[in-house]
């Protein structure tokens, strides 16, 4: 009995010493836990409900993610999740895209000027006045309008196949150029394949190394939205208006020369619409570029997202 009491006392002493041990400094270091929760919100902008995805701490540097055609904020789902530990990320859907309101083309002017004005007002209402932009496809004409209107607000540009040069217009524009020359039933009809499920799938898989690595949810979501009444009319209006972006290229190039914004290029070189020549052209106006070319297509994040997100993280820390 005496031995049992001694053993019990010894065990209690060992436990007490263990509890009083100084904590390992490695264990007490603060950790960067990923804030992977993405919030799905809406904001009324001049009578239009703008849907947007948001993640990360608003006290961290902000990156505004501007999507392309035919997509929505959905194209940035990986970025919103993976980079939210160090950055505040916000990705709006343009009017007529994603989960935002889709006013009829008879009631709403679908031009890049008008869409950019809504995104500018959206950021104003969100009180976001210092931010980097990530641009892709349609995100470039939206983003460069924001940048030229308020250059002091732009902290950096992350460019994934967002064009600003005539040299960057590829073979994929031939049908749309015919629409610019003469918009009629024939030139519109020639573009309708783009809105089919097969045409949308092609946009995501053309130029990729492994098409089977591209999530089919991307083009299936876009196709469902293409089935809405007047959706084709809305997109044809924007195709037709794209020629006005080209007229603004000199203005955007001057912005780049005058302001020399930090620029990260992460470009899919096999893009039929914006080939690598579009990426190369930025070297004419920006002195220092973090320049990265990928052997993939129009939506480089789909196939090379992990490396691109690593590049974004490194670039934004410089």
Identify the residue ranges that each predicted region occupies.
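Active-site machinery of serine-nucleophile hydrolases
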Residues: 84-93
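Bacterial N-terminal signal peptides that target proteins for export
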Residues: 1-8
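Bacterial Sec signal peptide processing site at the extreme N-terminus
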Residues: 21-31
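Active-site glycine-rich loops that stabilize anionic/oxyanionic intermediates
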Residues: 68-71, 137
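Serine-hydrolase catalytic-loop signature spanning alpha/beta hydrolases and amidase-signature enzymes
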Residues: 70-78, 89
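Flexible "cap/lid" subdomain of the alpha/beta-hydrolase fold that forms the substrate-access gate
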Residues: 29-50, 55-58, 62, 90, ...
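C-terminal motif of bacterial Sec signal peptides marking the signal peptidase cleavage site
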Residues: 17-18
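Structural cue for short, hydrophobic secondary-structure segments
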Residues: 65-68, 91
